[in-house]
Curated annotation (Swiss-Prot):
NCBIfam families: glnS (TIGR00440), PRK14703.1 (NF011291). L-glutamine binds at residues 91, 240. Pfam families: tRNA-synt_1c, tRNA-synt_1c_C, tRNA-synt_1c_C2. Its EC number is 6.1.1.18. This is Glutamine--tRNA ligase. GO terms for biological process: glutaminyl-tRNA aminoacylation; glutamyl-tRNA aminoacylation. Monomer. ATP binds at residues 59-61, 65-71, 259, 294-295. It comes from Bordetella avium (strain 197N). It catalyses: tRNA(Gln) + L-glutamine + ATP = L-glutaminyl-tRNA(Gln) + AMP + diphosphate. The gene is glnS. The keyword ATP-binding applies.
Amino acid sequence: MTQTTAPHAASNYLRNIIEDDLAANRFQGKRWAGKPGPASMQASGLPDPARIRTRFPPEPNGYLHIGHAKSICVNFGIAKEFGGVCHLRFDDTNPEKEDQEYVDAIIEAVRWLGFDWNTDGNNNLYFASDYFEFMYEFAEALIEAGHAFVDEQSADDIRAQRGTLTEPGRNSPFRDRPAAESLTRLREMRDGKHPDGSLVLRARIDMASPNINLRDPVMYRVRHAAHHRTGDKWCIYPMYSWAHPVEDALEGITHSICTLEFEDQRPFYDWILARLADLGKLARPLPRQYEFSRLNMSYIVTSKRKLLQLVREGYVDGWDDPRMPTLFGLRRRGYTASAIRLFCDRTAVSKSDSRIDYSLLEQAVRDDLDPGTTRSVAVLDPLKLVITNYPKDQTEVCKAPRNPHDPEAGQREFPFSRELWIERDDFREEAPKKYFRLFPGNLVRLKYGYVVRCTGFTKDEAGNITEVQAEYLPDTKSGTPGADSVKVKGNITWVSAAHAVPAEVRLYDRLFADPHPDGGDKDFLACLNPNSIQTVQAWLEPGTRAEPGATWQFERLGYFTVDSKDSSPEAPVLNRIVTLKDSWAA
């Protein structure tokens, strides 16, 4: 199902859950020592000042994209709504794919999106790697209690014994080894005495469980790899399914909000927490996991593998290419953080899978930019218009609102002269029916200026129109008493040729022409939109100063911003953020 329209206020089933939890005082007695830790540490803390605790737990192995923005908005937003705290936690348990570069980029992206984790007097920025000692201690406790064992089988053997959805698994020959033996092997793993892949720690649960995730899942594996924060201190690393619940509990998380692919992992999440709480390692009340459908959108891919392929093979100009769905790409394109938050607020939080049409994001951008964006004029495909009866050396001032929604913003002023630039599409040698712009003999208004009558045009040797001639009606200037003395059906925009500012303008569109580029067995590269970027040399209204961060609505064309990477005062580069209307609508 594709959602093409959005309610003004989207539903969020998590609100009902949290309201019920708070009404039932489920977190009464919960304590917080001011930092994450086991039960013994939290017992000495004060009552938790946060009514609820959520978390956004990215793995630092790539750049955040629009799908992550949804999770960020859900977790930070719902914590704020209920007087709680949201932690930013880096799930850095896979050293071979993670890097400090991504940590820094994620912090920057979350801050840019408008969220802060310093909300209760603490810096609630955490790393899973800070809990490695706790995790190891807990692993030994689980072995001693008979809840875990070290398996010396190969990964292929373990996989073969796992069973299927219709057949139970088979017990490992190491499943019933003495706890002391498993402890010895685990310590050898920690001390680097075994090669990668030779031993794993597994939970002892039920190989006949209908949920395959409870068939003695792997908790630790040997990986002789340097970690970006801990260096070579560790050569065993926890699996995510084991680390995730432990991290939540150590941080006092109340509502662990995940996407739907983790739903089948919830029984193991609960099993781990219950075992460790019974052993006195984790404080009650324990976190609970809840799932919602991930943000699936038309016309984009969010797979890290596919995004990396686009970058490495040169289909886009880096992770911040304005066509990319990364937050840095959207930011460079000119999408505002408030527009992305608005879009996320308009999409429901539910357990039903749906695909959101990209037009909803574009509309959120328009709705966000429209009230406060200064208007201006640009000519993207210039054609010279000469007003033959206007004095050659004369210039006068025309005025227009900076923003029609904000009278207090005042007027902008720009020059009118004999030679102007107009859009090539605003002239026709032979006009089709219902074409009300310039053609020989027709009257149009130069917006904010005069009414003119087309008197002729000039072509080059190839037959291309190079110039249009017209005469102006002196008593028809906009804003003067005679402005309405002549009625016309057409208005066109223009800039003074002698005063206009030259600029490179990049007309960005959707990266993919297919609404479902990653659907089925498609080659997603074959779905790329060949017209996702067009570069033109344009002329801008002279008051349009291309300063960093500047954004305008160019009348009739759309919203544009200064490119943060390639633009300079001497050579402005502008990006089209979004058109005024959905150009992809059927």
